[in-house]
């Protein structure tokens, strides 16, 4: 199954590594210029990807955190709360029997949740292995953040650290630390892709 990978946010080097490793795959950045895109525009880019039979797409948003608590620190990976209900399928999939649509949509939501959690775990493992004791893991969490709520595909939001924490801000401006963070995210996505392809894809066509 062919997989399209969409990268949004702070660390564009991740996309570069993915392009090198997967030249046959479509790697999309939600922006490749300095023009600011709203969160809605970013998820619109993701949702506009047209899938053919045996194709799938994932969305990875990379963000830098901030807090009123200047001591807050660490990195975390978010996925959409499993209890949040939304429409992820085109209603044409059940045009012959509309009563089937809620069932099919619910099944797809569950698939997306499973894949999002798995992707989050792989990425967290990658970050922990690369960053070590330079920063702390805040864990994998579920919430209804805009980017994971509005991307109709398996998706995660990665918060790489707090700019409002003086020490962490210095780390995030360090080339060596950014390289480790980039490598950790890349390793996690790559591990997910490998798992995905070995299982021949575990999401049906949108």
What are these regions (language model features)?
Residues 2, 8-206:
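Active-site-proximal helix/loop segments of hydrolytic enzymes
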């Amino acid at each position: 199954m062919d997989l399209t990978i969409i990268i949004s946010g702070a660390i564009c080097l991740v996309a570069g590594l993915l392009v090198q490793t997967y030249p046959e795959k479509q790697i999309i950045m939600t922006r490749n210029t300095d023009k600011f895109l709203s969160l809605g525009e970013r998820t619109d880019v993701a949702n506009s990807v047209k899938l053919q039979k045996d194709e799938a797409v994932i969305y990875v948003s990379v963000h830098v955190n901030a807090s009123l608590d200047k001591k807050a620190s660490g990195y975390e990976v978010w996925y959409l709360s499993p209890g949040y209900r939304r429409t992820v399928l085109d209603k044409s999939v059940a045009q012959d029997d509309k009563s089937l649509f809620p069932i099919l949509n619910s099944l797809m939501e569950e698939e997306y949740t499973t894949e999002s959690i798995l992707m989050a775990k792989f990425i967290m493992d990658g970050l922990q292995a690369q960053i070590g004791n330079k920063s702390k893991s805040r864990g994998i969490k579920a919430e209804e953040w805009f980017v994971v709520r509005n991307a109709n595909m398996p998706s995660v939001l990665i918060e790489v650290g707090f700019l409002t924490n003086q020490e962490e801000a210095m780390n995030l401006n360090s080339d060596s630390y950014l390289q480790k963070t980039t490598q950790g995210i890349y390793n996690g996505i790559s591990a997910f892709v490998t798992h995905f392809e070995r299982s021949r894809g575990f999401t049906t066509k949108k």
